[in-house]
Swiss-Prot record:
Pfam family, one: Chlam_OMP3
Lipid attachment residues per UniProt (S-diacylglycerol cysteine): C19
GO molecular function, one term: extracellular matrix structural constituent
Protein name (Swiss-Prot/TrEMBL): Small cysteine-rich outer membrane protein OmcA
Function statement: In elementary bodies (EBs, the infectious stage, which is able to survive outside the host cell) provides the structural integrity of the outer envelope through disulfide cross-links with the large cysteine-rich periplasmic protein and the major outer membrane porin. It has been described in publications as the Sarkosyl-insoluble COMC (Chlamydia outer membrane complex), and serves as the functional equivalent of peptidoglycan.
Subunit structure: Part of a disulfide cross-linked outer membrane complex (COMC) composed of the major outer membrane porin (MOMP), the small cysteine-rich protein (OmcA) and the large cysteine-rich periplasmic protein (OmcB).
Topology term for the membrane: Lipid-anchor
Domain of life (superkingdom): Bacteria
Signal peptide residues on this chain, from the entry's feature table: 1-18
Length: 88
């Protein structure tokens, strides 16, 4: 019984941390791929549900590989179009 409770507690902590990482990479990074969906990631349960965003790691460069972001300000400097969509 104690092992079951400990395992359940551990899984909830892992799920919570996975959830935070999903929010970080899916919603804060405008360049996250379309397939990077928290719901789909949870449905797949890859590696026990611990593989947030299917292994996607947010990049620190603008979408489209542009390097001349010194001249741009605000969201456009991060590769976001004026209407909020990520530049492809």
């Amino acid at each position: 019984m104690k092992k079951t409770a400990l395992l359940a507690a551990l899984c909830s902590v892992v799920s919570l941390s996975s959830c935070c990482r999903i929010v970080d990479c899916c919603f804060e990074d405008p360049c996250a791929p379309i397939k990077c969906s928290p719901c789909e990631s949870k449905k797949r349960e890859v590696n026990g549900g611990c593989n947030s965003c299917n292994g996607y790691v947010p990049s620190c460069k603008p979408c489209g590989g542009e390097l001349d972001h010194e001249t741009k300000q605000g969201p456009q400097a991060r590769g976001i179009q004026a209407d909020g969509r990520c530049r492809q």
